[in-house]
UniProtKB/Swiss-Prot annotation:
UniProt-reported outcome of changing residue 307 to H: In CPVT2; reduces calcium-binding; impairs calcium-dependent oligomerization; causes 50% decrease in calcium-dependent binding to TRDN; causes 50% decrease in calcium-dependent binding to ASPH
Matches recorded under CDD domains: PDI_b'_Calsequestrin_C (cd03074), PDI_b_Calsequestrin_middle (cd03066), PDI_b_Calsequestrin_N (cd03065)
SUPFAM superfamilies: Thioredoxin-like (SSF52833)
Lineage: Eukaryota, Metazoa, Chordata, Craniata, Vertebrata
GO biological process terms on file: cardiac muscle contraction; cellular response to caffeine; detection of calcium ion; intracellular calcium ion homeostasis; negative regulation of potassium ion transport; protein polymerization; Purkinje myocyte to ventricular cardiac muscle cell signaling; regulation of cardiac muscle contraction by regulation of the release of sequestered calcium ion
Record's compositionally biased regions (Acidic residues): 373-399
Annotated organism of origin: Homo sapiens (Human)
Modified-residue entries (Phosphotyrosine), positions: 282
Name of this chain's protein: Calsequestrin-2
């Protein structure tokens, strides 16, 4: 899994004027909190923390650009370590050359990756290398893997979570063997997939849950899937979630953006750009939801929704690469290998496609009628046209 990561520092520098108390954004204080890990100090360091965050890097070269890139990543980790100093989270560096034996023991195989050790689990962080993203990711990871719901207000909050995969189960108590299996299954997917449980009969009734039953909610779907053959073992729950882990409509998130991008279907993604905070973007997203609900049983369909507001530093890159305007809703098919793309023609914001028109376009993509090779042909035509124009110009000059 080799790629060039886009590392975004995410550090904001305060102006010289004094900030009001309560709004002092953290800046690096110069104290070293990130240490080098070796076989000699590994066990000692591991015992000190509930989570251990390890940056596995190649030896720092003499190249100035490479050195600066490494220093930027180091500063990000130092700031995160500073912000989370009150938590039981440790931060270390692992040199791929000096500590090759330790890296092999830990199963590290990709230089430039960030790994988190939690108990007997190793989680690879596959998102945007930015301080705010890392802090949120680690705070989610340090929490209990299952959140308990015990009131009507908490049910309402649960129901409003629509853009994550989520599961909820009804169990007799925390001592139930079936709850323990559910909890252990949750650890496999934390923090990417949300696991909830209730021991309250009233909550279970409101959610139409039977004892020891678990419901699986796909993002943006109105109705859940009741996992069959209850009660379940840990292995059965893990297997079911893995089989249903690619939703019909999913959101690209900073904390898992690279992993999501690599989870393509036959080398392509159907990508939709829409700003949820914008009226036209919101309307387009609602149309996408309707299409996803109508086609949730199609295993070949997975639409990747990107809210440009989540990735402000990538907007200009995407507009240049895909030749589109991200201030308007867009949907297209993207080749993940070379970023070739073809985009649906949407005349203007006041004339967004209907769900039926969008379904027809998607069917053409899935059938191969619309594909990124068309984009290559268009580029070739443009090149040929330019050459012909140049030839004509040369002829005129000769005359």
């Amino acid at each position: 899994m080799k790629r060039t990561h886009l590392f975004i520092v995410g550090i904001y520098f305060l102006s010289s004027c004094r900030a009001e108390e309560g709004l002092n954004f953290p800046t690096y204080d110069g104290k070293d909190r990130v240490v080098s890990l070796s076989e000699k100090n590994f066990k000692q360091v591991l015992k000190k923390y509930d989570l251990l965050c390890l940056y596995y890097h190649e030896p720092v070269s003499s190249d100035k650009v490479t050195q600066k890139q490494f220093q930027l990543k180091e500063i990000v980790l130092e700031l995160v370590a500073q912000v989370l100093e009150h938590k039981a989270i440790g931060f270390v560096m692992v040199d791929a050359k000096k500590e090759a034996k330790l890296a092999k023991k830990l199963g590290f195989d990709e230089e430039g990756s960030l790994y988190i050790l939690k108990g007997d689990r190793t989680i690879e962080f596959d998102g945007e290398f930015a301080a705010d993203v890392l802090v949120e990711f680690l705070l989610d990871l340090i929490e209990d893997p299952v959140e308990i719901i015990s009131s009507k207000l908490e049910v309402q909050a649960f129901e409003r979570i629509e853009d994550y995969i989520k599961l909820i189960g009804f169990f007799k108590s925390e001592d139930s063997e079936y709850y323990k299996a559910f909890e252990e299954a949750a650890e496999h997917f934390q923090p990417y997939i949300k696991f909830f449980a209730t021991f309250d009969k009233g909550v279970a009734k409101k959610l139409s849950l039977k004892m020891n039953e678990v419901d699986f909610y796909e993002p943006f779907m109105d109705e859940p899937i009741a996992i069959p053959n209850k009660p379940y073992t840990e292995e059965e729950l893990v297997e079911f979630v893995k089989e249903h882990q690619r939703p019909t409509l999913r959101r690209l998130r900073p904390e898992e953006m690279f992993e999501t991008w690599e989870d393509d279907l036959n080398g392509i993604h159907i990508v939709a750009f829409a700003e949820k905070s914008d009226p036209d973007g919101y309307e387009f997203l609602e149309i996408l939801k309707q299409v996803a609900r109508d086609n949730t049983d199609n295993p070949d369909l997975s639409i990747l929704w990107i809210d440009p507001d989540d990735f402000p530093l990538l907007v200009a890159y995407w507009e240049k690469t895909f030749k589109i305007d991200l201030f308007r809703p867009q949907i297209g098919v993207v080749n993940v290998t070379d970023a070739d793309s073809v985009w649906m023609e949407i005349p203007d914001d006041d004339d967004l496609p209907t769900a039926e028109e969008l379904e027809d376009w998607i069917e053409d993509v899935l059938s191969g009628k619309i594909n990124t090779e068309d984009d290559d042909e268009d580029d070739d035509d443009d090149d040929n046209s330019d050459e012909e124009d140049n030839d004509d110009s040369d002829d005129d000059d000769d005359e």
